[in-house]
């Protein structure tokens, strides 16, 4: 074949390949209506706005941010902690828009850009369930379109919400949260802690006994020996900026009151929470996301799926923040689940 023919053939091949790629990308891209901001009062603020909710102690304002337009599927993101802002879930922005998912970042009361009344009387599960319901109404969510994705504490809250209001839900995603705090604590004590350097573990437990968990020495021990192993599996110096921003802006008092001083088990108000036997009452489609190296027992998470009448399991090769550790699996499974419902 002459050099001219070879060039022509190559050009034709590139043209065909390019057309196929464009067609594929076009098929995968969200429709133009996804970017339609008609009728949205938040169009001038990039989707962000404040909404007012009622509480037993009076009205408060919450920060929410809408991304996309899809009246058939509205996904509300519930952050973990308790006490973390929406910042660490900004990773969703790299994946969900391409799938045409309308979703909402949301700072719970006492976190991020929302009001921080610093009132422990408001730190109860029933009140937070009511808060989520008020946010649902504010974004126009109902049984035809409303889905919750709760990560960690947000997963606990999402389970509680579904048990109270699944008649207003289309689907549920439980990300990295066991349905029992006692079982979560057992996994830490009986499985994860025995694998640690026992001298380091003793130092950590000794600090906890003294109550001096706010001292740098405590986190200096936890970070390489627990957080880098089970929370986000890379050196802390390489943690993504959104995660660091969420940590820096964390409501520590809220966190310690509800969870305890660290991620090495729970000792706060949530210590006796257990809903495993109630999972069978959640009849909407539910995706359970579990990380191999998480502080949440993968075998227990698989058992949760068996309890859920319409449960599905997404097992990742990551830790507690597997939306960073194993993005192909996390977002591949999440988007496939949501697309079936869209």
Residue ranges and their predicted role:
Residues 173-213:
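Flexible "cap/lid" loop of the alpha/beta hydrolase fold
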Residues 276-318:
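Conserved loop-alpha-helix segment in the C-terminal half of the alpha/beta-hydrolase fold
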Residues 16-18:
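C-terminal motif of bacterial Sec signal peptides marking the signal peptidase cleavage site
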